[in-house]
């Protein structure tokens, strides 16, 4: 017997669930420094967080939600990206904190587009804010800026007073790092929780991930790991330090241990 999704809405929900699971698997494989997962309560509502390591937004940590259309992925309507806190950016509305995806996609095509494309776009607007507002070059070689964006004030400041824009963004970055530790606004078990580094709690997980040769190569004089890591105050600095330690491993001809993929604690 042939079943149609029109007569069997439960089958449509099952198929939609498989699509969402496939999207989540792609997100895990394709991207770094940005995390997103469907909520436990509803697969059409995703929780996300991005750690920005480069550009004028470096050091920022932003939470956001992705809201998918009811008929995802068949619906041509674009997902809605809403940031949890105010973010100064030309493409983010200062009133409702939504990201404008219209400059990136005209419509959603289920055979071509995936949620990781949206996440990649989020990364790109923070990595290169100025590039995200340019449409090309004039005959004289000057950059042509978009006429309309969600936040025209942010656009004008970025174009006419870049130092002021950077100053405001860096103030915002400090605030974002403080807000990331706020209590979850929901009891959904899939909400992404970020915790400050705590030696007593986290060193045991480091012990599981790093072999004795790693510890020997990365020891800093007589300092305890917690004392040394206490001087690292940003995710970017942590990445830079890890790169330095990897170089030490190679210079000392110590084989690099196989590292398990660390997943965000949910």
From Swiss-Prot:
Residues 226-266 are annotated as: Disordered. The lineage of its organism: Eukaryota, Metazoa, Ecdysozoa, Arthropoda, Hexapoda. Transmembrane segments: none annotated. Residues 245-266 have a biased composition (Basic and acidic residues). Residues 15-178 form the UBC core domain. CDD domains: UEV_AKTIP. It comes from Drosophila sechellia (Fruit fly). Belongs to the ubiquitin-conjugating enzyme family. FTS subfamily. It comes from the Eukaryota. This is Protein crossbronx-like.
